[in-house]
From Swiss-Prot:
Residues reported to bind Mg(2+) 2: D83, D86, E226
Natural source organism: Campylobacter jejuni subsp. jejuni serotype O:2 (strain ATCC 700819 / NCTC 11168)
The protein's name: Fructose-1,6-bisphosphatase class 1
Assembly and oligomerization: Homotetramer.
Top-level division of the source organism's lineage: Bacteria
Cofactor note: Binds 2 magnesium ions per subunit.
Length: 280
C-alpha cells in the first residue's frame, strides 16, 4: 500500500503546483451527478489518472468526475476512489480546497477501506495520511512531505460546520443546530467539506453535518469519494460518525459508485447529542 500512497503524494504535489496559475473558468461539461465541471476539476482528474495509472499496485480507480470505474491492472489488489478537487467552486475566491482519496482492497466498500488521505491546498501544502492513526504531513522547501504530528479528537469541541440549504432542513435538524449555538458553538462552514473536516480535526473537535433535506433526501455528499474516507479518518482519530440513524457511516453499503448519504462527523459529545435529537 505504501507504493499507492507514494503515487498519491506525487499527484497531490503536481496539483498544488498547477494551482499557482489556475484556469478558474467553467467547462461545458457536467459530471455524473450533474455538477458543471470547472476546467481545473478536469485537469486535477487528469493529473491523478495519469499518475495513478503508473502504479502497478492499483487495480482500478473511481473518480467523482468519471461515470464508471476505470480498470488499470486486474491482477493488482487496491482500488483508489477520489474526489480530485473538493471545494473547487471556491477557487474563484481563493479559499482552501483539497483532494480526498480512499484506498480499498479488492472491492470498493467501507469494510474494505484500508487507508484514507486528503490534501489541503492552502497557505501551505499539507497531507493527512491515515492507516491506523491520522498523521499530518507538510511539504518543506525540498519538496518533501515531513511528519508534523498525530491527530486526535477531543471528547467535545466548539466548532459547528453545518451544510445544506436551511429552508429545506427538517425541524429536528434545525432544533439540533440551534441547541449547539445556544451552548456557545462557533459557526465555521466554508462550503468545502475537506476544509471543514480538516479544521475540526486539527482544532480537536466539533461537528460537521450535511443532513437529509427536502431537496436532497439522500444527502448530497458521495459515499465512496468523500464520506467513507473522511469517516475513516475521523473515527481513527477517536471521533464518531453517523447518518443520523446508525452508529457509524462505515456500516453503510451501496451498490452505485456515485451514491450519496446524509452524514455527520464529530466528537463523541456532538454525535451522541445528534443521535439523541434525531431519534427521540
Amino acid at each position: 500500500m505504501q507504493e499507492v500512497i507514494s503515487y498519491i503524494q506525487k499527484a497531490v504535489l503536481e496539483i498544488s503546483n498547477a494551482l499557482k496559475f489556475p484556469d478558474t473558468s467553467y467547462s461545458q461539461n457536467q459530471n455524473f451527478t450533474g455538477d458543471t465541471q470547472l476546467k481545473f476539476d478536469v485537469l486535477s482528474d487528469e493529473i491523478i489518472t495519469k499518475t495513478l495509472s503508473q502504479c502497478s499496485s492499483i487495480k482500478a480507480i473511481i473518480s467523482e468526475e468519471k461515470d464508471e470505474i476505470l480498470t488499470l491492472n486486474e491482477r493488482a489488489n487496491f482500488i483508489v476512489a477520489y474526489d480530485p478537487l473538493d471545494g473547487s467552486s471556491l477557487m474563484d475566491v481563493n479559499f482552501a480546497i483539497g483532494s480526498i482519496f480512499a484506498i480499498y482492497e479488492e472491492k470498493a466498500s467501507a469494510k474494505n477501506l484500508r487507508a484514507a488521505l486528503y490534501s489541503m491546498y492552502g497557505a501551505r501544502l499539507e497531507l493527512v495520511i491515515c492507516k491506523d492513526q491520522p498523521k499530518l504531513y507538510r511539504l518543506n522547501a525540498n519538496n518533501e512531505f515531513i511528519f508534523i504530528k498525530d491527530l486526535r479528537m477531543n471528547e467535545k469541541g466548539k466548532i459547528n460546520a453545518t451544510g445544506g440549504t436551511q429552508k429545506f432542513w427538517e425541524e429536528k435538524h434545525a432544533k439540533f443546530i440551534k441547541s449547539l449555538f445556544d451552548e456557545g458553538y462557533r459557526l465555521r462552514y466554508s462550503g468545502a467539506m475537506v476544509s471543514d473536516i480538516n479544521q475540526i480535526l486539527l482544532k480537536g473537535g466539533g461537528i460537521f453535518s450535511y443532513p437529509a433535506t427536502q431537496d436532497a433526501p439522500n444527502g448530497k455528499l458521495r459515499a465512496f469519494f468523500e464520506v467513507f474516507p473522511l469517516a475513516f479518518i475521523i473515527e481513527k482519530a477517536g471521533g464518531k460518525t453517523t447518518n443520523g440513524k446508525n452508529r457509524s457511516l462505515l456500516e453503510l453499503e451501496f451498490d452505485k459508485i456515485h451514491a450519496t448519504t446524509p452524514c455527520f462527523f464529530g466528537s463523541e459529545y456532538e454525535i451522541s447529542k445528534l443521535l439523541k435529537a434525531y431519534n427521540e
